[in-house]
Amino acid sequence: MSVERARKIKLLLFDVDGVLTDGTIWLFPAPAGVQLSTQQHARQHGGEGGFGFVSQSMMEAKGFHAHDGTAISLARLAGIKTGLITKRISETVALRARDLKLDHAYQGIQDKLTVFEEILRKEGLRPEQAAYVGDDVIDLPVMRNCGLSVAVANARAEVKDEAHYVTEHRGGDGALRDAVEYIVKAQGKWEEVVREYTRERSPAR
């Protein structure tokens, strides 16, 4: 039963694209002086820059939902460590991870299971004490080896089929908040955590 699994969770890990975001990736031309201009790249590559030519001339941006940011704070108050594991590399994600004070942030990862096992060793935890939130097939190896596997509402069918819990909201629209609420409520800490969260932001006068 997924509620029983949720009661054991001490670590919550998640993907970024499609989980913290809706999966959309915005690309913008890099500011002048930051990288070589598109024209310079084109000249260097004889007009055939390919994927490298484009990626070196662009900057990546992502959008995040405020509810998911609050979820990280709520998880922390419940004594749950948090972290992200993502295939892409983005300064935007690095900034968001620092802003949210995540315990773990791994980017550029193809083999997510190896990183998952590394984090478990660092934290001194067992697989059944970790939850993972994913949306696509690259997340399945971790989801198959963690205690509570969570799929966002718009995850691929293969991912939903193997999840212990499917969120009400879509990726980038509060899905991580759903996962945190589910876990913290299963542990009987929700009301206490909400009180502590509001107390921190509205101290008694």
Q: Where are each of the predicted segments found?
A:
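Short active-site oxyanion
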Residues: 79-83, 102-104, 128-130, 145-148
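Substrate-recognition element of Asp-dependent hydrolases with the DxDx(T/V) motif
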Residues: 70-96, 107, 143
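Short beta->alpha linker loops
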Residues: 88-89, 97, 110-111, 154, ...
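Mg2+-dependent phosphoryl-transfer enzymes with acidic/Ser/Thr/Gly-rich catalytic loops
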Residues: 3, 31-33, 57-58, 65, ...
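Active-site neighborhood of HAD-like aspartate-dependent phosphohydrolases
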Residues: 1-78
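Short, well-ordered beta-strand core segments
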Residues: 12, 82, 105, 149-151, ...
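Short, electropositive alpha-helical surface patch
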Residues: 92-111, 202-205
